[in-house]
């Protein structure tokens, strides 16, 4: 008996016993008959490859597989079932009897495989027909081993095939009648139908949570960025407003005025002489001091730079506007900014 056939028998038996919810027995599946027809043909073709085939010493009893179709149609379903059941059971007995007469050989191995196929057919018919009392049908005796394999093929193509095609649908319908008890597969099916809804709800919840989390974080970032925009604009405007004032506060020694008052000198303003090393800002009257708050970034007295760095104070500062020139003073045609930037112009101014 081959391993595949043994596994098929075990599968059929477990299916019929452990799962009572399956309505149709294995014999109702047409693939089973087709498989057995192919296997019987392959097994009979292997018989020609055995070198030691001899007639049996004792003839074996085999069922008569020939029948009349007209007579078969007139019989009842119960009679047909008993006839087929009896023929298969008698064939199994003949195969076992023929194998018992042989020792280990190629023919004995093939007869062992044939007995496995006959048992498989008998088990499938038992699941469909139940246990039947075999009637006293027609029998034949044979010594030729080839007749045993041919009897099985003719039985499958004849009586078994007509029984499954004609009476099979009616017998399978009786086996599939619903019972009052609710099968377990139904409850399992209902449970599985509910699972997609729960899964979709869970996915929707997770998506909404992630959307809310992402939306709130993005909103906070936008609000923070929006709050920073006015401050950046204010700083930019302050920097632009402070630029003229810083340009006008050029720290260059020009007649002691740092370029604030063009063409004026401390003598014309009535200020005392400034000793060397002192700051010119201290010598100016209070009404001429520049209107900006002192910053730690301004250089100490006596040290001058061309352009002072931009202040870092966040408070807005008014641009430095010089007071109008004194009409009594003579206006200098040279710009104090250019004089402070170029020492050559400073020398020319002093010479004048």
Swiss-Prot record:
GO molecular function, one term: cytokine activity
Disulfide bond annotation, renumbered to this chain: 28-172, 50-106
Polar residues composition bias: residue spans: 233-245
Signal sequence, renumbered to the chain: 1-23
Assigned keywords, A-Z: Cytokine, Disulfide bond, Glycoprotein, Hormone, Secreted, Signal
Family classification: Belongs to the EPO/TPO family.
Name listed for the protein in its UniProt record: Thrombopoietin
Organism: Canis lupus familiaris (Dog)
Gene, per the UniProt record: THPO
């Amino acid at each position: 008996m081959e391993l595949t056939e043994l596994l098929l028998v075990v599968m059929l038996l477990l299916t019929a016993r452990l799962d009572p919810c399956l309505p149709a027995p294995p014999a109702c599946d047409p693939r089973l008959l087709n498989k057995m027809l192919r296997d019987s043909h392959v097994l009979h073709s292997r018989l020609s490859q055995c070198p030691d085939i001899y007639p049996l010493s004792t003839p074996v009893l085999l069922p008569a597989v020939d029948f009349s179709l007209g007579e078969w149609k007139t019989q009842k379903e119960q009679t047909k079932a008993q006839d087929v059941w009896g023929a298969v059971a008698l064939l199994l007995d003949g195969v076992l009897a023929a194998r018992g007469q042989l020792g280990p050989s190629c023919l004995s191995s093939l007869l062992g495989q044939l007995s496995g196929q006959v048992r498989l057919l008998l088990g499938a018919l038992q699941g469909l027909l139940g246990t039947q009392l075999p009637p006293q049908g027609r029998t034949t005796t044979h010594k030729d081993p080839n007749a045993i394999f041919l009897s099985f093929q003719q039985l499958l193509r004849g009586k078994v095939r007509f029984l499954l095609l004609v009476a099979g649908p009616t017998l399978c319908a009786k086996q599939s009648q619903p019972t009052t008890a609710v099968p377990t597969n139904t409850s399992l099916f209902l449970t599985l139908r509910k699972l997609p809804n729960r899964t979709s709800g869970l996915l929707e919840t997770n998506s909404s949570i992630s959307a809310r989390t992402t939306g709130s974080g993005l909103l906070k970032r936008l609000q923070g960025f929006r709050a920073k925009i006015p401050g950046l604009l204010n700083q930019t405007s302050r920097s632009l407003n402070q630029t003229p004032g810083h340009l006008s506060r050029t720290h260059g020694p020009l007649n002691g005025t740092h370029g604030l008052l063009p063409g004026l000198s401390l003598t014309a303003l009535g200020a005392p002489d400034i000793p060397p090393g002192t700051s010119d800002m201290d010598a100016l009257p209070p009404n001429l001091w520049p209107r900006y708050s002192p910053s730690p970034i301004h250089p100490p007295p006596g040290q001058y730079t061309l352009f002072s760095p931009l202040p870092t104070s966040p408070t807005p500062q008014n641009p430095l506007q010089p007071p109008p020139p004194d009409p009594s003073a003579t206006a200098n045609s040279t710009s104090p900014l250019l004089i402070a930037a170029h020492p050559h112009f400073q020398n020319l101014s002093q010479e004048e």
